[in-house]
Amino acid sequence: MHSCNPYFYDVMRRMVNQHPKLDKFDNARLGMGWWTNRIKDFGFGSNLGGHVPGTRAGLVPDSTYYNNIYGRRHWTFRTIYSISIGEGELLTTPMHMANLAAIMANRGWYMEPHLERDIGGKGKP
């Protein structure tokens, strides 16, 4: 059995630890900020289905979130790496995952997600 998790752990580690002159705490803080901004570019952490009842924004943790939980300079990559595989404190919805798939299918172009009431004018199923 093989897993892609180690690949995504490594990608996250390289993003978080990209400043060799900084200590592990400052690296985590700066890298977490960069990661948070990139994830939000894909719509995570926002309510994508404003016109769909019951949709939620989910949660994309940031440095402030971890500082509130662990305290400043008390968390590192080892504390946060589970979010690199969509676990831990990262909260998503089915709408977020559908939106991510749509962005990839549209070659990086974002289109506001919509739910269809009927297909081909045949009315509700």
Model-derived features with residue positions:
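Beta-lactam-recognizing serine transpeptidase/beta-lactamase-like catalytic domain environment
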Residues: 1-125
